[in-house]
């Protein structure tokens, strides 16, 4: 005998945060940040065979001001790192980052001075997608995982402050190339 039985038909009971999360996850606009081979697989995700538009991501944005998801696909060189950070800073809040491929996540086979050993050195990363290169199906799965993160994100007056704290903590964290015992 709860309120659900007493509500007239046509009414839905939900929290505002649940509705906002549902709307946000269904309207991600990714910015193009294809830097190497993984970009080919990212482009393939937009083709009719994989159809990323069924998740509300019809068009990859060329302007960071119109995007809220950055998919970093491929290695990031030291010269490109400030540009990647500038594009991230120009994106509107709330914003998310997906690191696509082993090169973006940890530098991959390019273990030298010219390549950033993981994009997490310059950006807070929400989802790491392994593979060289990862298949479009894996990218779609990572996007679905990100959807779940977005849907369950809290709302409130201090949301921007909390986001800055999370970003600062992510940038202070131990980089993946310095971690030991991950495979043991």
From Swiss-Prot:
Keywords of this entry: 4Fe-4S, Cell membrane, Iron, Iron-sulfur, Membrane, Metal-binding, NAD, Quinone, Translocase, Transport
**Binding annotation for [4Fe-4S] cluster:** 37-38, 103, 132
Q: Which cofactor does it need?
A: [4Fe-4S] cluster
Q: Which domain of life is it from?
A: Bacteria
Q: Which GO terms describe its cellular component?
A: plasma membrane; respiratory chain complex I
Q: Please name the InterPro entries in this protein's record.
A: NADH_UbQ_OxRdtase-like_20kDa, NADH_UQ_OxRdtase_20Kd_su
Family in the record: Belongs to the complex I 20 kDa subunit family.
Q: What is this protein called?
A: NADH-quinone oxidoreductase subunit B
Tell me what organism the protein belongs to.
Beutenbergia cavernae (strain ATCC BAA-8 / DSM 12333 / CCUG 43141 / JCM 11478 / NBRC 16432 / NCIMB 13614 / HKI 0122)
Classification from the root reads:
Bacteria, Bacillati, Actinomycetota, Actinomycetes, Micrococcales
Gene encoding this polypeptide? nuoB
């Amino acid at each position: 005998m709860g309120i659900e039985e007493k509500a007239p038909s046509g009414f839905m009971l939900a929290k505002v945060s649940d509705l906002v999360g549902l709307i946000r996850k269904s309207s991600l606009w990714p910015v193009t940040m294809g830097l190497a081979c993984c970009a080919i697989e990212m482009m393939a995700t937009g083709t009719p065979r994989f159809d990323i538009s069924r998740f509300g991501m019809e068009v990859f944005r060329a302007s960071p001001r119109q995007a809220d998801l950055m998919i970093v696909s491929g290695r990031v060189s030291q010269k490109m790192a400030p540009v990647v950070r500038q594009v991230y800073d120009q994106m509107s809040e709330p914003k998310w980052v997906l690191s696509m491929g082993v090169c973006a996540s940890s530098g991959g086979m390019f273990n030298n001075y010219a390549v950033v050993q993981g994009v997490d050195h310059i950006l807070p990363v929400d989802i790491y997608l392994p593979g060289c290169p990862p298949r479009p199906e894996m990218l779609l799965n990572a996007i679905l995982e990100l959807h779940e993160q977005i849907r369950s994100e809290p709302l409130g007056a201090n949301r921007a402050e909390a986001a800055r704290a999370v970003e600062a903590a992510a940038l202070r964290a131990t980089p993946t190339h310095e971690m030991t015992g991950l495979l043991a």
